[in-house]
């Protein structure tokens, strides 16, 4: 997963 602008993991999603 990649880091999103939220600062979280994209897979966490």
Swiss-Prot record:
Tissue: Expressed by the venom gland.
Cellular component per GO, a single term: extracellular region
Post-translational modification: Contains 3 disulfide bonds.
UniProt KW keywords: Disulfide bond, Neurotoxin, Secreted, Toxin
Chain segments annotated as transmembrane: none
Top-level division of the source organism's lineage: Eukaryota
UniProt main location, coarse: secreted
Location relative to the cell: Secreted
A GO term for molecular function: toxin activity
Membership in a protein family: Belongs to the CRISP family. Venom allergen 5-like subfamily.
Note: Shows similarity with the venom allergen 5 from wasps. This similarity may explain why patients with allergies to centipede venom also display allergic reaction to wasp, honey bee and/or yellow jacket venom.
Record protein name field: Scolopendra 20385.85 Da toxin
Species of origin: Scolopendra viridicornis nigra (Brazilian giant centipede)
């Amino acid at each position: 997963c990649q880091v999103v602008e939220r600062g979280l993991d994209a897979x966490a999603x």
